[in-house]
Amino acid sequence: MKLTVILAVLIGTFVLGCSSTAPAPNATAIPEPTPIPTATAVPEPTTVPIATAVPAPTLLPAATVVPTPTHVPNPLSVNIHPTSCSSPEIGISKKWVETLESANFTKCVRPFGVLIGAADGIPDVYIAQAAKIAAEILDPDMDGEPNDSTVFQLVSDYTTAWIPMPTDRNSWISGGVEDELGQKLRSYGLQLPQWWMIGDTEFGDLNPDQYAKAVMVEEIIHFMTQFGYSRAYPEIFGVESWNSLIAKETKRASCDWWQHPENDCPNNPRLYGDCSDPDCDVTEFYHQVLVTKAGMEPGWLGIGFPTTPEELDLKLSPALKAAMEQPKYNQINKPLVFSYPNRAVTVR
């Protein structure tokens, strides 16, 4: 009993002790952290599109510059009668007049601006015939206007090329007159000399015969091809390389049905000289093609060259025939009449 009381007292004391324990102080409240202001959103930079690389342009070969005719009188005289080179009708510079006269080239004519300058001994009728041929090639319908304005501009620039008609072979070649004129005038002279037209004879009082006309046609076509059509349409009529249509045709025909006597072929060497460059071989070949196809007879024929239009037609490639027959190229397609009328017109 006593033990029970003691235990009860102890238990009560323990309970009181526990109940008298001071309550634990509340934990200091940790303040909520001051919110850090949200940074202003920096917008994503606008995406700059990457520029598409522009490839460098492919360099194309520079087109041949078409020169403006120099000193072409207006209205342009299509007068086919020769006159003094100093005449206003001719319209060449004073330097040219003086240089020509110093070499005894005193007579000139300019059909559609093409300068033909003749030595004093060339009869007027020969000069006039050459002028008529040049005019008819440029204006085959003879309406007073050149059919191809681009070719007209090219061949009427006498500071690039002209047609001299010398009389004395010795002074022209051996005496250096040809070279001297070339150096002073800086223009290519595609010659139409007396000795090619009539040989070593004298002119007399007769008009040019068929052979003399054929020589005129050949040299004037050479002139028109080399300084006109070749530069206006180099991909078709070019004679400066072997890349044009007529140059490739020349190569195709070479040593088959065409050989210039100054060029070599297997088992048939050249007779003299050298005409292997395109500006010679192609020019010579195309003259014979053009003249024969138009129904005329060349002054001479290359070795193996067809003698009739029908034979030639069987030899020519379809591509060349098609090009020659296109109206825009204004190639002669019928025999010349050799009688271009005298007139003066304004060429635009």
Please state what every model-predicted region is:
Residues 1-5:
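Positively charged n-region of N-terminal signal peptides that target proteins for export
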Residues 7-15:
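Bacterial N-terminal signal peptides
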Residues 17-76, 83:
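Ser/Thr-rich, Proline-interspersed low-complexity disordered segments
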Residues 73-110, 144, 253-259:
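A domain-level signal for the mature, folded cores of soluble proteins
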Residues 102-104, 111-257:
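Acidic/His-rich structured neighborhood in mature extracellular/periplasmic domains
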Residues 118-122, 205-212, 271-283, 302-312:
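Conserved aromatic-histidine-acidic binding/catalytic patches
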Residues 228-302:
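Post-HExxH zinc-binding segment in Zn-dependent metallohydrolases
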Residues 289-348:
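Pan-zinc metallopeptidase signature
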